[in-house]
């Protein structure tokens, strides 16, 4: 990736600007031209063509460069103060955050149970296929709550002998299991609703129970909406999965209620049609969730911009680094594993080389996206690949 000549040996007591000429530096005077901050007309954003399309591409390029320089600035701060953020949360603040996350999860599970009981009663009273589809969705909320609680609980009990690299992979696996069950349920509702439409089979609804159904389903939608807002205030992936689940419930409850009311007031077939809409929405949404989480488990590479950011950090880590042979970052769960090969002088004492490699590893693992970093130290870079070739 790059190399540099020898830049003076010996220990450095203090560093001046002249001593740091080996470092990569980015300027602070780069700004996106003002004309690219302005949004093009609405029609041009929908159908980019001609000069507007070119303007959009150039603005995107400048924005990308601006973000890259911002990343470089963060890496410089990390090299200077030893951490990414001087305002990083303390241990007490982290404990408070964890306490808040547990409260959000427990509150979601308790409310899901209460609302599920209410929706079961609404389903029994209305016999609406759309309401039943929404109720079955709430049943899976309870199942998802158990799966996500179990994965969160398991991740908090590490076992370095049985699970040497931790249990963080349990999080996407739990989400995949839940999403698969959600998709299966949606498919079953789709089949039953289609059967009702084909056979012209439907239930006669009692108008006296209409207000009770409206109150029950509306209350569920309102409660779920506020739960969604609360859970979205957290950064924890499991809590945010709950937020996504609550958002789905707002949609399915609203569609189920509207479909049932339209079926009562106008045409009976609007009820199974609403159930089909809920089923299709459930299947497509959770299929997308499965694809996203499977992608985190199969070792997908980090974006080129992130690898560039890592390379900048590695190069500026220590003056004695002669060459960067390899920089890899790939998903193995929700975070990245990073592999780095650096070249140091061949006559450097082992203890000194070890300290440089270990401090670089610790620095890389401070990045919030990185779960584990592996730093390999070598004295030359002309050798053949050291790992078994891919078949």
Swiss-Prot record:
Keywords: Ion transport, Membrane, Transmembrane, Transmembrane helix, Transport, Vacuole. Involved in sequestration of excess metal in the cytoplasm into vacuoles to maintain metal homeostasis. InterPro entries: Cation_efflux, Cation_efflux_CTD, Cation_efflux_CTD_sf, Cation_efflux_TMD_sf, CDF_Transporter. The chain crosses the membrane at residues 104-124, 135-155, 172-192, 211-231, 247-264, 267-287. It holds the Pfam family ZT_dimer. The gene is MTP7. Residues 1-21 are annotated as: Disordered. It is a multi-pass membrane protein. It is found in: Vacuole membrane. Residues 125-134, 193-210, 265-266 are vacuolar. Belongs to the cation diffusion facilitator (CDF) transporter (TC 2.A.4) family. SLC30A subfamily. Residues 1-103, 156-171, 232-246, 288-391 are cytoplasmic. The keyword Membrane applies. This is Metal tolerance protein 7. One of its GO terms (cellular component) is membrane. The keyword Transferase does not apply. GO terms for molecular function: monoatomic cation transmembrane transporter activity.
């Amino acid at each position: 990736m790059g190399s540099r000549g020898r830049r003076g040996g010996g220990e450095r007591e203090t560093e001046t600007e002249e001593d740091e000429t080996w470092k990569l530096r980015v300027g602070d005077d780069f700004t996106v031209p003002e004309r690219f901050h302005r949004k093009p007309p609405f029609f041009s954003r929908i159908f980019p063509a001609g000069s507007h399309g070119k303007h959009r591409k150039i603005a995107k390029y400048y924005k990308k460069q601006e973000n890259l320089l911002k990343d470089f600035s963060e890496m410089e701060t990390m090299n200077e103060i030893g951490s990414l953020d001087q305002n990083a949360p303390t241990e007490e603040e982290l404990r408070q955050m964890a306490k808040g996350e547990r409260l959000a999860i427990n509150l979601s599970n308790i409310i899901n149970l209460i609302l599920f009981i209410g929706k079961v009663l609404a389903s029994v009273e209305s016999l609406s296929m759309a309401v039943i589809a929404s109720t079955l969705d709430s049943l899976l909320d309870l199942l998802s709550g158990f799966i996500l609680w179990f994965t969160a609980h398991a991740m908090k009990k590490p076992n370095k002998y049985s699970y040497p690299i931790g249990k963080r992979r349990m999080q996407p696996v739990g989400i995949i299991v839940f999403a698969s069950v959600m998709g299966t349920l949606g498919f079953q509702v789709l089949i039953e609703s289609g059967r009702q439409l084909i056979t012209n089979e439907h239930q006669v609804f009692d108008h006296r129970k209409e207000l009770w159904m409206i109150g029950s389903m509306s209350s569920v939608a309102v409660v779920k909406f506020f739960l969604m807002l609360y859970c979205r205030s957290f950064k924890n992936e499991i809590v945010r999965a709950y937020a996504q689940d609550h958002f789905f419930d707002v949609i399915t409850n609203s569609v189920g209620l509207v479909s049932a009311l339209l079926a009562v007031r106008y045409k009976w077939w609007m009820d199974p049609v609403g159930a089909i809409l809920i089923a299709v929405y459930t299947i497509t949404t959770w299929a997308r969730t499965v694809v996203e989480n499977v992608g985190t488990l199969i070792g997908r590479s980090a974006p080129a911009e992130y690898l560039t950011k890592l390379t900048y950090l590695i190069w500026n880590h220590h003056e004695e680094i002669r060459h960067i042979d390899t920089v890899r970052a790939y998903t193995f769960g929700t975070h990245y594993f990073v592999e780095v090969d650096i070249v140091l002088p061949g006559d450097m004492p082992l203890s000194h080389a070890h300290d440089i490699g270990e401090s670089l590893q610790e620095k890389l693992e401070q990045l919030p996206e990185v779960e584990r970093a592996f730093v390999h130290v070598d004295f030359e870079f002309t050798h053949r690949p050291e790992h078994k070739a891919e078949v």
